Regions:
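Short beta-strand/loop segment that forms part of the nucleotide-sugar
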Residues: 31-40, 59-62
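Short, acidic, metal-binding catalytic loop of nucleotide-sugar glycosyltransferases
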Residues: 21-31
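Conserved nucleotide-sugar donor-binding catalytic segment
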Residues: 128-220
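Acidic helix N-cap motif at the loop->helix transition within catalytic regions
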Residues: 14-17, 43-51, 90, 94
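Glycine-rich, basic loop-to-helix element that forms the pyrophosphate-binding segment
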Residues: 61-77, 98
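A conserved acidic beta->alpha catalytic loop
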Residues: 22, 38-47
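Short aromatic/hydrophobic "clamp" motif used to bind/position activated sugar donors
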Residues: 82
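Conserved donor NDP-sugar-binding/catalytic core segment of glycosyltransferases
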Residues: 90, 94-128
Length: 261
């Protein structure tokens, strides 16, 4: 079985090596196709990627947005399974083998999601209560639950490329919640399998999109929930979004106080 992993990157010199090595170090009974879509980086990203040119496909061109880069990479992909991993996130050891084994055990499965943790600039786990909460929701998947709250973590989500070709691709209209619209598109086609293993780590740092845009992210998610659901699920999503926004703000306040003390 062949897995295609796409990494969009622009000026990602700080973490790209860690991301690449977490992918290329994966071992198991599968074939890996790794495509890095660089948006004409002006830092040392391309020099770092050059070290791995024999083990991955590197495309460097202006793409306009991460969504466009991922869509382009998916068009190039030749694997049966697809995913993307952003240029600051990492796979856990054994992730791709777990994914392959799950799809083999469940041949009708079209997509799956697993557990994910949040890490800082130094790979240290942070915000454990949020991780626990989202991973707990993962046990109770239904389309309506997903409409009321986005609990699926992007770095730990994988799909059959046949499904990708049957849904709308990533929408550049959204700046922070484009993965959520993809989940809703996929949910309209098939029910995912929940893998009860840690598959990836999502890095939260000062330059990350989600770190600086969580208000925008939840507003976009609310719009998507209204588009794919009804008044009830949209209201529930609004309640849950406000709750999470305040939790994030409180965590930021506590973190700032800890730095000053």
């Amino acid at each position: 079985m062949k897995i295609s992993v796409i990494t969009p990157v622009y000026n990602g010199e700080k973490y790209i090596r860690r991301t690449v090595e977490s992918i290329l170090s994966q071992k198991g009974d599968f074939e890996l196709e790794y495509i890095v879509c660089d948006g004409k980086s002006t830092d040392s990203t391309l020099q770092i990627l050059e070290e791995y040119k024999d083990r991955c496909i590197i495309v460097s061109r202006k793409d306009g947005s991460p969504q466009a880069a991922i869509n382009s990479g998916m068009e190039m992909a030749t694997g049966e399974i697809g995913c993307w991993l952003n240029a600051d996130d990492i796979f856990e050891p054994g992730t791709l083998q777990t994914v392959v084994e799950t799809f083999r055990r469940h041949p009708d499965c079209q997509w799956l999601y697993g557990r994910c943790r949040i890490i800082d600039e130094h790979d240290r786990e942070i915000r454990k209560p949020i991780t626990l909460y989202k991973n707990l929701l993962g046990y109770f998947y239904s389309r309506n639950v997903l409409l009321s709250e986005n609990f699926i973590n992007q770095p730990s989500t994988f799909w059959k490329m046949d499904l990708w070709r049957r849904v709308d691709h990533l929408n550049s209209k959204y700046k922070a919640a484009w993965d959520y619209e993809l989940w809703m598109n996929m949910a309209n086609k098939a029910r995912p399998i929940h893998v009860r293993k840690l598959l990836a780590s999502f890095r939260r740092h000062s330059e990350s999109i989600s770190q600086n845009n969580f208000d925008k992210q939840f507003n976009e998610e609310l719009e998507i929930a209204g588009k794919y659901g009804n008044a009830v699920t949209a209201f529930l999503h609004w309640v849950n979004a406000r709750k999470i926004v305040w939790i994030y703000k409180l965590l930021a306040i506590f973190a700032d106080r800890n730095k000053k003390s």
